[in-house]
């Protein structure tokens, strides 16, 4: 029987099991199955996935993120805010501004602190990727951004493809509460045009500074929030002329609000909370 200490944290209800790999050990070949086991709501702790906080050669810390199906993702906005909180409060970093390595690249985090506890974290997510190769997405044609139609259930849905280190398909609807989240979501997620699968967002524009947001995450399904998805949604809204560069946009997710801005300089900034749920020790056994 193996075990490790964990901290369960969430960003707007998007919860992960966080493991401090400066202190704990999990075999590389076991990571996918451990992520699946620990995320199981019935036989594990229950979460949207597992995130490892690891040593890095290029930053104070490195984040590795696994979905609850065991697949490894390249980035996670809500996860980054929680990693920033954990790293600061456990003195893995120096100062309130620091970098975090991800599989999608290095990002900069800035934390707001009250009584030695992080209450908010702002992440510079870098510039969005908009080409088919960067997303990645199969097909022909290279326009300034990809906007395509997808026929589902005799209805044509237009989506805008954006990568924030992971792929997103953003669909604008009149009412997110009646959007085909659990039907179109998994169909588009696993469509062959997306070789690495895709996260699917449904967006309802409220005004030039607010939007409602619902998400079907690849590898996890419906979640309360998706930080990279909120970033992709704001980018897509600006690309489609629905919002403006430089403004801070309030994104209303099922789990709460994020503040997102696509700056004139080209980077996307995300600001929001990160909270601890519980701590403990998880025991597991890998069948031979």
Curated annotation (Swiss-Prot):
Signal peptide: none annotated. Pathway: Amino-acid biosynthesis; L-lysine biosynthesis via DAP pathway; DL-2,6-diaminopimelate from LL-2,6-diaminopimelate: step 1/1. GO terms for cellular component: cytosol. Its main location: cytoplasm. SUPFAM superfamilies: Diaminopimelate epimerase-like. The active site is at 76 (proton donor), 226 (proton acceptor). It is an enzyme of class 5 (isomerase). Its EC number is 5.1.1.7. Gene3D superfamilies: Diaminopimelate Epimerase, Chain A, domain 1. Substrate binds at residues 14, 67, 77-78, 166, 199, 217-218, 227-228. It catalyses: (2S,6S)-2,6-diaminopimelate = meso-2,6-diaminopimelate. It holds the Pfam family DAP_epimerase. InterPro entries: DAP_epimerase_AS, DAP_epimerase_DapF. The record marks 168, 217 as: Could be important to modulate the pK values of the two catalytic cysteine residues. Transmembrane segments: none annotated. One of its GO terms (biological process) is lysine biosynthetic process via diaminopimelate. It is found in: Cytoplasm. Homodimer. PANTHER family: DIAMINOPIMELATE EPIMERASE, DIAMINOPIMELATE EPIMERASE, CHLOROPLASTIC. Belongs to the diaminopimelate epimerase family. Catalyzes the stereoinversion of LL-2,6-diaminopimelate (L,L-DAP) to meso-diaminopimelate (meso-DAP), a precursor of L-lysine and an essential component of the bacterial peptidoglycan. This is Diaminopimelate epimerase. The gene is dapF.
